[in-house]
Amino acid sequence: MICEPSGGYERDLLEALWAAGIVVSLVNAARIRAFARAQGLLAKTDEIDAAVLREFGELLKPVALEAPAPERKKLAALVQRREQLLVTFSTEEQRLVQTRDPAVRKLGARLIKQLQTQVEQLEEMIEKQINDDATLKQQSERLQQVVGIGKVTASTLLAEMPELGKLSRNEAGALAGVAPYNRDSGVLRGRRTIRGGRVQVRRVLSMAALVAARFNPILKAFYQRLVAAGKPKKVALTAVMRKLVILLNHLIKHPEFTLA
């Protein structure tokens, strides 16, 4: 079976397929549309989409999506809820700044306080969920050995990137959305770009890279070399993100590996 993401609505289908023992692949919608366009199919209907999905699966044999373990599933739910509340928290703070009416400001401030309390409760639940599972706890501690990786980044990676430790270097970079893609043709050498990947993974990695570029001795030197060579700071930070996710994947894959 093959399907594509649909804003979370695909989860019930995935759960039902896993429960029935049916192998399923979840493929990025952009790949499916590119596959359709390559065949000259520009129209988009449910019937066309179903036919394209079937043919894509038959020809390219995408990797099957494994059912998450119950403890990972619980962690993912908690982490995703934390992210939702943080987005709402930020939005309400911006609204409060622009609000002038005293009564409305009071209501807004009360809501922000409630959101903050819920975020703190979720942080406690996330920490407990990780500490109650030996594997999650060990992996979280392992990730946090890297300067730049804190509890939030570690919990997000464990929840949103459960494949960590099972990937190749290129797969880790691509899944995080920090793998460089060439745009070359003939003698033309275009700029390398990044795209795709998991949004929340890329977001926490970007924050971790900012810290690592300042305080991680190895990655700081790497970042400074790139900047000194003329690379834009944003490009250099993206390179740090890629180094980070490759290192983190290696740490989980090889428990015997120790950081110098």
Describe the function of each predicted region.
Residues M1-A109, K113-Q116, V235:
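Phosphate- and other anionic-substrate recognition elements at nucleic-acid/protein interfaces
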Residues M1-E4, D49, L53, L85, ...:
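Short, conserved catalytic/metal-binding motifs centered on acidic residues
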Residues L85, L115, L143-Q144, L167, ...:
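A short amphipathic alpha-helix within small helical-bundle interaction modules
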Residues L96-V152, M161, A213-N216, K220:
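Helix-hairpin-helix/helix-loop-helix acidic hairpins
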Residues K151, L157-A229, K233, L259:
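Phosphate-backbone recognition surface of nucleic-acid-processing proteins
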Residues A228-A260:
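Basic, amphipathic alpha-helical segments enriched in Lys/Arg and hydrophobic/aromatic residues
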